[in-house]
A protein has these predicted regions:
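Mixed-charge interfacial surface used for oligomerization/domain docking
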Residues: 1-145
Length: 145
């Protein structure tokens, strides 16, 4: 019962720096993928109320998307910048990007300093997103429909 009551409070935010697998999977057209790659577009996505992956924002450059994902955490984390709950980062063959997100999160959320855990994305999810994907998970506001 607790899980059912709280499952929508887990925030899932993702970005990808490589659109190749999105093109191969049919989620992005070849033309859009080519243009997106040329412009260094990194989509910012999240899991909605129904558990579906939703594109939220198209951000230019890796540096800016790392800042954008951290801003989402500031906006949605339980207790804002005073958040002291669990924080996980997963990545698909981009450890340095995951570490950059962790470093930024730890610098802005003082209670998390040294407590952000980084893991690899599993093969099932990784086969859909490909390399260059970073996911940020934390406890926050309930996801609405």
């Amino acid at each position: 019962q607790w899980v059912e009551e709280n499952k929508r409070k887990v925030q899932h935010w993702f970005f990808s720096t490589d659109l190749t697998f999105y093109i191969k999977g049919g989620r992005v057209t070849k033309t859009a993928g080519f243009v997106g790659t040329m412009l260094s577009i990194c989509p910012l996505l999240h899991v909605n109320y129904e558990g579906k992956l939703i594109p939220v924002q198209k951000v230019r450059t890796k540096k800016k998307v790392i800042e954008a994902i951290e801003k989402k955490m500031e906006e949605l984390a339980e207790n804002g910048l005073a958040y002291d709950g669990k924080c996980y980062i997963s990545h698909s063959a981009c450890q340095a990007d995951a570490e950059a997100v962790a470093s930024l999160v730890e610098s802005r959320f003082p209670n998390l300093n040294g407590r952000v855990l980084i893991n690899s994305i599993g093969t099932t999810i990784g086969s859909h997103t490909g390399p260059g994907t970073v996911a940020l998970f934390f406890w926050g506001e309930e996801r609405k429909s």
